[in-house]
């Protein structure tokens, strides 16, 4: 599902950032993963960025995990509501004009279609579906928008669903909206 979702969004089915990119991140967003237990080496890299760059760590997971215990912002959402969560975050990004307009203009095709879909996911609707309060969504969106370059990490918790392809595409669209994709720091 990752390869198909990324290929459909970016045009090729591969991830973009390395551990060295993570070291230079000013914000870190993790969804569908628990590096503390599943990828301890990657957690060391995340913690290095958190400590050296004062990078806020945002962890989105239905369960409070060992990784979530390290988070500056833990977002508990209903299982399977990843797309609604991401669209809710993007609603705040577009509503507050936090998107990277120049990056979108130069490198992104179809963001107007994404924007039209995201308009349906205001704070009330997103909270109804995900269980996440609109105030927390706005806070998380603002953290990611104000701390660039950032890192967005997803793992099999988001991809191993019947809607995993949709999750992956939403994750990619979020990165494109903020200009986080394809940035080599």
PLM segments and residue spans:
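Cofactor-pocket helix-loop regions in the catalytic cores of large enzyme subunits
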Residues: 1-180
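Conserved small/polar residues in nucleotide/adenosyl-binding loops
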Residues: 183-185
């Amino acid at each position: 599902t990752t390869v198909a979702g990324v290929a459909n969004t970016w045009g090729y089915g591969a991830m973009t950032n390395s551990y060295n990119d993570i070291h230079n991140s000013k914000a870190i967003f993790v969804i569908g993963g628990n590096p503390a237990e599943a990828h301890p080496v990657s957690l060391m890299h995340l913690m290095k960025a958190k400590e050296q760059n004062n990078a806020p760590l945002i962890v989105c997971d239905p369960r409070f995990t060992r990784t979530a215990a390290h988070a500056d912002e833990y977002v508990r959402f209903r299982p399977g509501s990843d797309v609604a969560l991401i669209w809710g975050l993007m609603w705040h990004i577009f509503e507050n004009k936090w998107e990277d307009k120049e990056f979108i203009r130069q490198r992104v095709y179809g963001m107007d279609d994404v924007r039209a879909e995201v308009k349906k996911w205001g704070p009330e609707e997103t909270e109804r579906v995900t269980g996440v309060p609109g105030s927390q969504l706005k806070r998380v969106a603002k953290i990611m928008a104000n701390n660039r370059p950032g890192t967005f990490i997803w793992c099999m918790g988001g991809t191993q669903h019947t809607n995993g392809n949709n999750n992956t595409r939403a994750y990619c669209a979020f990165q494109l909206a903020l200009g986080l994709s394809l940035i080599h720091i």
